[in-house]
């Protein structure tokens, strides 16, 4: 009995061993056969229509996919462009040729339209029941679009696609191509990769293209193109001229047509590439040198015409028609969800570009600003007196776009402005505490406080720094060290941060700002990079209610001082410093400030305060509108809404 059992076990073992050996031999021969085909694929690929998948959040990958499709068509190679969102991954084993153009979104994750496909590949590759030959009939290539600013997650999706496809038996025709949206070389990198793909598809050797991935993305800059600002909403006509990075990628000239190379000086390249310069110029910016910009604000135009000033006029007494809006750094360290520049200017964690001199920037900004003011001559409401005043700027809002405090010579630039008796309002995004500490006295220093908790700050600001929260808190602490006027700027986004009342109040004690500006987010139109809608825009009554609640929380330390209803903005002031005998002193004595700076002696924020006029005080019937100006309301000629008809 035992002998029979032993024989059966041996026979079963031999059968298993034979089957395993046969499987291994079959798999080896199959893979060897497919590998040989991959080196000369023309005989097998011509009969099959390939697919180009674009995995895209904002349209960059889609635009590149369209370029690749046109290139293939010009070479008589048939492809279909496919949005993976509408594709059934279970059909992938039927494909014989696929090309992926894949971008990487926040946290190294795929954009929404490619989530299901990427996840399906990942799950299949990890599922032992699927096997490693599922895609053995499929040849593929991958090009990734990402930003080195995000470190290890750079082109993570493209690399994962390649790994998963190989793990399922797919044959990679050429190495993964990697393009960086920041370095100005995306078009060249993509074209090199495309050339490699076409070469293989037309029967060339895959080995000829092995160097492609090494050539792509050699620059190590720490930036990304996107757009941001802290200032007032822009004229409606500016939106039509915006060029998104996706459009740039789609319309950029090919390598054969001659790509404009990025200018380098002493090994450092210019922050603003020719393509980005063209984009920002279409948005109304005047570019100064290689990294600065100036733009005329809608409120500057408004007060030139006598139609009212911005909230700074109501809160601090600036003359809006004499205010220049500029920045010495178009780069930033955040990608805020409420950013309305449609993500077309750089971001970075440190300064790595060619640097222009402060005097050159200030002179260039003033010259360009004055030229824009001159264009207002003859516009209805613009008097010769107002025009002449506008040609002599007295204020500078260093908050146009980007992070001005990143500019290494920011103190020297401030000196240039103060030397011309131009006041300075600088806004920082609270990611560079060491820069705040080293700042010389300026008229008013802002820190953007876009959220009150670590989780919501990450969701709203989308910062590049991994230690963004620590930097944020340290920036608030640094603010407390400053002797001049300091401000927290809160941007309320309904449904995102309006419920964090207690958390906001806890931040007050860290920086102890002189003022707290609370402003409702401005809706800037739909964008693939932003999920905000009009539902996220608070009413002025919402902003007032939030401000009053914060004031109550402070137990009298802060009170609501001013409002500017048109901008949906409210100001809290520190009562012990700026409320004297029941009257608010939020305005600034600008001449006194410049005298104090020129003296070289230490001074504080109360040394140059001035009384707030009654029309700007919170609760006044004017709502912060200067009665010396003429209120103008646009006529809305929208067709009337259809009335319900009762049967």
Curated annotation (Swiss-Prot):
Which reactions does this protein catalyse? N(1)-methylguanosine(37) in tRNA(Phe) + pyruvate + S-adenosyl-L-methionine = 4-demethylwyosine(37) in tRNA(Phe) + 5'-deoxyadenosine + L-methionine + CO2 + H2O
Against PROSITE patterns, the record matches this protein to: FLAVODOXIN_LIKE (PS50902), RADICAL_SAM (PS51918)
Q: What is the lineage of its organism?
A: Eukaryota, Viridiplantae, Streptophyta, Embryophyta, Tracheophyta
Q: Which CDD domains does its entry note?
A: Radical_SAM
Please verify whether the record's keywords include Oxidoreductase: no
The pathway entry for this protein reads as: tRNA modification; wybutosine-tRNA(Phe) biosynthesis
Family the entry assigns: Belongs to the TYW1 family.
**GO biological process entries:** tRNA processing
Annotated positions binding [4Fe-4S] cluster:
332, 336, 339
SUPFAM superfamilies per UniProt: Flavoproteins, Radical SAM enzymes
What residues does the Flavodoxin-like domain cover? 50-198
Output the Gene3D superfamilies linked to this UniProt entry: 3.40.50.360, Aldolase class I
Q: What is this protein called?
A: S-adenosyl-L-methionine-dependent tRNA 4-demethylwyosine synthase
What region holds the Radical SAM core domain? 316-559
- Example GO molecular function: tRNA-4-demethylwyosine synthase activity
GO CC, sorted alphabetically, is: mitochondrion
